[in-house]
Amino acid sequence: MNQVATKKEGALSANLFEADANKGSQNISQEDLALPFLKVLGQLSPEVNKTHGKYVEGAEPGKIINTVTNELYSNINVIPVFYKRQYIEWQDRGQSTGAPVAIHEADSDIVSTTTRDKSYKDRLPNGNYLENTANHFVILMGDSPTTALISMKATQIKVSRKWNSMMRGIKMQGKNGLFTPPTYSHIYNLKPVQMSNDKGTWFGWDVAKIGPVTDKSIYDIAKNFAERVGKGEVQAKHGSEETNSTPY
C-alpha cells in the first residue's frame, strides 16, 4: 500500500494568510452572522444544568456568558455604542418555538391593547405577552474587541435607565462650551450582583463608569458599529434564552 509522507512544518506565515484575506467568506452577509448576547446566568439557565444539552463547563449562577463563544466572565468592560428599546412579543413556555412572535418598536400602539395579568405580564388579546426590552449594543473589550448585545428586561429595566442616565450625564468642555459626548466615548464595567424583592432572589447587572476611551482605533471600531446599528445593518436575533435569566 502506497503511503504519502507528510512533511512536518511550523506555523504558516501571516503574510501567506494576508494574501488570501477574506476569501471563503465572500458570500457571508450580516444575515448569516450571530451577534453575541452577553447575559447573566441564573439558577434556571440551561448553561448551568449539567443534564441539559446547552450545559457549559464551569458555568454557574452569577457568571456572565457570551452566547456565541460560551466564554464565561466574572465581570466585563464594554463600550456602549447604541441603545434601542423594543417590545418583544412572546408565547408562553410550552407553546413557544423559542423565537419571538414579533418585535414591536417602543412607540408602537400595540402596548395600549395589553392588560396586566396575575403574573404581571402584559397580555395581548391573542394571549401572547409583551416584554419591555432595553437593548444595549456594545463593544466587549479584551485582547480582541468584539461586538455584542446586552438585553435587559423586567427588573433590569431600572438598571438600563440608570446606565442611560450615567451616559447622558457625562459632560465635556469643548471649544463651544459644554457638550454631551457620544456614548461610545466611555468604557463601563458591568458585573453580576444578587438582587431580591418579595418574590425571590436573582442575579442582575451592576454598572460602573471606568473612564474615557483612550485608543483611537478602539474608538473608530465603536463608532463604526454604532453607525451600522443605526442604519439597521445589524439586527439582533432574540431567543427565549438570550437575555438574563431574570424571573422577576
Regions found by a protein language model. Give the residues of each.
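Extended serine/threonine-enriched, polar tracts that run as long, contiguous segments within proteins
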Residues: 132-210
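Short peripheral tails and domain-boundary helices/loops at the edges of structured domains
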Residues: 208-246
